[in-house]
């Protein structure tokens, strides 16, 4: 999935995943360029149409947790008072690969950049403890979609759930079941979002 922001304007273009799992541990990657990208997870009960065209982050993120590449902050669930909790800046105009590990068995999400350690010393394998995790408050009552949105100024994102990607992959890492093609290996216990894995874990 490729999403590109316009050269000017204020609209946010969003793309939600077509799968909306309720359980399991999932890994996907974002290859991005530019400072105006949001990546994360949201409640499927909100409705996919909300994520296609966001005109305001604040008014459209009542059930989502997303990382903003402008300064690496986490925009959060319910109101702007939950925003910018963690410092994890990407830098402006640079290319990067973001790994996203979503634990829907325990309601946690983790981000890494370019295969390095997870932000806030996060440990995706910490289970219910959620070491360094970003909490997903809706996880035990609603299904979850994974979302990428891009704003103006020409920012571009390529989202890879492990299947077809228009970006280049140099290392071709897969999950423990042998599915997916990622730049970096998924954490232990996390899987590519595909039909066969969903049937087993989702």
Feature-to-residue mapping (PLM):
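PRY/SPRY (B30.2) beta-sandwich protein-interaction domains
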Residues: 1-202
